[in-house]
Amino acid sequence: MEPHLLGLLLGLLLGGTRVLAGYPIWWSLALGQQYTSLGSQPLLCGSIPGLVPKQLRFCRNYIEIMPSVAEGVKLGIQECQHQFRGRRWNCTTIDDSLAIFGPVLDKATRESAFVHAIASAGVAFAVTRSCAEGTSTICGCDSHHKGPPGEGWKWGGCSEDADFGVLVSREFADARENRPDARSAMNKHNNEAGRTTILDHMHLKCKCHGLSGSCEVKTCWWAQPDFRAIGDFLKDKYDSASEMVVEKHRESRGWVETLRAKYSLFKPPTERDLVYYENSPNFCEPNPETGSFGTRDRTCNVTSHGIDGCDLLCCGRGHNTRTEKRKEKCHCIFHWCCYVSCQECIRIYDVHTCK
């Protein structure tokens, strides 16, 4: 590991106690192999870090769906890393820390808004898919979509019960967001925005039946989209996220913080929009305080004028170029019937990395 990254990582780990105070550290279950077999080891609920009492009760009462919860968080993290692969902050995780994103999510930034939304959406998605696959006895197919068929098709297969997946995500992910402060309000809003995206993208999926693929009759069921579509949608919401301001109100239970759109001339955010109220760091240089790893040695696109281009990604520091040889399949030929044969070629590429 590069010395500057090693020093940063040590800073993040040693400063972890400060980070954990308001952090959903139960996300770390996505990185633990032990949680894939929760159904056969009920005592592991107590070993999941960061669970509040309500989450612990949920885990023990619905132990068989906890592997899906873990899989959903993992799915959300992977999608975050895909969506931000060309950004200065690329959704880096720290395997040896309970705060798996480091201090980055300590602030109420756009990045924090996106991660909460995609993680909550991931939990809803994975639980819904698991139920449709029959891996749990407490859920199954959606029984609501069995009404009159449409023209040329009939109901069949297993419609995915996204309402149940959303309910699980809401009960589990929102359990810790019960404080009367602005950060809890922000997290709950963005969690719900992620889950709403799942419901909004449900669609009919059909299979044709008939002689020679004539599709005389179609069997259809209610299905979730590919999770990539959810990530793409939420990434657009990240780019257009609404900046908020914090307001304090005196209520019977004490002071309560709420959020209000900062700019009254703009359309106020809906339940489908992401919200934030603190500015992001520029992520150009390593900084243990903000959790930034910097962009040194990151691969950049020399032909792009976007954020993944060498000018912006490297923050004006310039870039290095090296050549790299790669083995690739080439001159492929299709043989009847039915296989493809290829030769192996060596191709040379220019690789550009930030200084």
UniProtKB/Swiss-Prot annotation:
SMART domains given in the database record: WNT1 (SM00097)
Entries under Pfam families matching the protein: wnt
Family annotation (CDD domains): Wnt_Wnt3_Wnt3a
Glycan-carrying positions: N90, N301
Keyword Ubl conjugation belongs to the record: no
Key words of the record: Developmental protein, Disulfide bond, Extracellular matrix, Glycoprotein, Lipoprotein, Proto-oncogene, Secreted, Signal, Wnt signaling pathway
GO CC terms, sorted: endocytic vesicle membrane; endoplasmic reticulum lumen; extracellular exosome; extracellular matrix; extracellular region; extracellular space; Golgi lumen; plasma membrane
Family classification: Belongs to the Wnt family.
Descriptive protein name: Proto-oncogene Wnt-3
Record lineage: Eukaryota, Metazoa, Chordata, Craniata, Vertebrata
GN (gene name): WNT3
